[in-house]
Amino acid sequence: LPWRNATFCPLECPPNSYYDPCMTGCPATCVDPQAPQNCSKPCVEGCACTSGFLLSGDTCVPEAQCGCLFEDNYYSEGEYSVNENCTRLCRCEANGQMVCSALSCGEDEVCKIHNGQRGCYPASTALCHIYGDPHYNTFDGKLHHFQGSCNYTVVTGCDNSSVGFSVTTRNKHRGSQSWTALNSVALSLEGLHIALRERKAVYVNGALVSLPASPAPGVTISLSGSYVHVSTKLGLQLQFNGDHELLVKVSEKHKGKLCGLCGTYTGSQQDDFMRPDGVVVPDFNDFGASWMVPDDEWPCDPAISPPVSCSPTEEEAANKQCSILTHLGGPFQPCHAVLPPQTYFESCVYDQCATGGSTEQLCNDLGAYAAACAEAGVALGDWSAGTVC
């Protein structure tokens, strides 16, 4: 029974439509202009398209401006479709014609869905951070404290996925059999072997080089602040401080293709502890040891020493020292919303226990969080002011 009128609870209808208190439950659309003729649904109140117009999505358009039915999906005029691997772009043109052309993503782009639309978009990056005793924040954000003192693969391609590079690190004991830290880094790619050693010494294919250097097209090595920075055209960047800290940044185009101590970069932490044989294990020591690389120049004991235990008093002191990372109103608060500090706080407490409350190591751990914040786009300024650093 009609109850609305122009002055009582009027229903505003969009252009090219009108209010109908009992319109068909199967309105004519660009996909099915004959829908009302075979409709068994009861009539409904709503906005019906004016004669000569058809429903395209939620808009009434002239029949001549209807879109395209393509691969069982309807597209309005001007809308486009990209296939699953972004090699074809099809656009709905006038008169219902879908016109397709070849598509290729750029070198710094990846094929993905963004805001509901598949296409070629700028590749994001993921960071793996290695520092301290050592601690590994994987590409997917999982923290582990593998204490091996040998040579290990931190990132390489999984199985048959060729990413074109491999990064290994040598660890060594520092002052205690239960304390190890990163000593040097090696990058292998396209016939190059780049070694980043202590005190920021750099070797390319065995020869010591001065910085900046460009040993191959698309590969640059330079000093940037406190780090030796290696940039490659393969979507890999390294930053090594010449002591204990390494930042490994990879392009999104490598997502799902990586393995090593930096994890799998699949978007899930569940498979980060994957061994070279493809088996995911729960124990990080089993996982870490599986990535050991034979190295005649780096004799080591593959046995993993347990970490030093911390007494309640020592743990309380460590928590107090490291709380500056999580303190609201402290120098690191501006970064909290972008990069939660909890894993860095946990690593800091771990290191304070392992080193007997070393001030130097405390400052190393605070600096590691500051470096990660900088990579995330948060500049903390002189964070060390007012601290023991």
Model-derived segments and spans:
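Extracellular/secreted glycoprotein ectodomains characterized by long, lumenal stretches
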Residues: 1-389
